Amino acid sequence: MITEEFNTFVRTHIEDDLPRLVLAAAKYPGVDVRAAALRIEGLRKIKDKLPEWYACSGVVIPAPVSAEQCSSAFTGEYKQRFITPGTLVYDLTGGLGVDSFYFARAGARVLYAEPEEGLCRAALLNFKVLGCAHSITVVQSTAESLWDFLPDLPSPDMIYLDPSRRTGDNSRIYDLEACSPNVVELRELLLHKAPRVLIKISPMADISRIVTLLPATKEIHILSARNECKEILVFMERESTKTLSRRIFCEPGFSFLMEEESRASAEREALLGNRVPTPGHYLYEPGASVMKSGAFFLTAQRYAVSKFHTNSHLYYSDKAVPDFPGRSFVIERVLPFSSRELRRLSTFYPKANLAVRNFPLSVAQWRQRTRIADGGNDYLFGTTVRTGSGDGHFIICTTKIDEKP
């Protein structure tokens, strides 16, 4: 039972050392201190992820794992673009209720379905204290059995699912068909019940396989924050067919049809550089979403930059490209990769950020051989460059001129 006294205890001790708090449990008769410690751990996990929830004193997090698996404020707000005010949305994998909360915030009426009783109770409480309970109906049910349990439910405008990507022992899984619920098996039922279906899947998933498994896919959205891929969203429509052009959206502001990359790849010779860039030129590193999308040759074509090598996903140009979807750098010097250059590299760069793309050394091996400390304002890229006389390994020394979110 979640009581006001228990919540007060949790919030009072939110900054405490948890092992010490548990050891001092005898000082707090009438309080399940171990349960409180788990709640505190869960709240700490949403402090940066869901600051509005963390700041609301009545919010409860049943277990740390539910906080780890839930959407963030960033991804929750992103999903609001799929919502039209007044529409009915079924969230069939309710969990902590973050996505239901943001759907309701966008003006949707939401049915939250979740098989775990503890999560349903927590969601009811959280929706109430967050001021959205009037827009969300909570039902304890699995996605698979919802319509058997409630056969007269009205037809939703959209169904949302975030299949569990963990096994019973809490280890991660990446195969879409191994997730629960199995959206591959359910896809026909889902599209029969709703004209639009939105599915959140692992950022490790293979996009081409997604399209094969879910042929009604119309759009794929790749969400990244701080240059790390966080989520992939698959948007399906009932009327979509296997021949439909599928658009991939990469944040920020870069989208393309899948066949565009195929056409650009067919023209790869024109997009590959054939020389070593020189100081004063610009180096471009695609953002995490672009890298995940696989739009390697289309990026070169669309932004009029040259690709270092077929397998080196870095680009360069002699002119600045201010809207490049990633990070931009000015090239300060270019060094051939050799034992001699490695030995003297730390003389010029005692501290630097290192990255490798299609390079003989890993970053760890590079640091070990040069003793270059991590950090600073210099960025060194080890990569393979296609030149007029063949492929060569080079170290491109740069300074950053722009940082995309």
Sequence positions of predicted segments:
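SAM-dependent transferase fold signal centered on methyltransferase-like domains
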Residues: 1-405
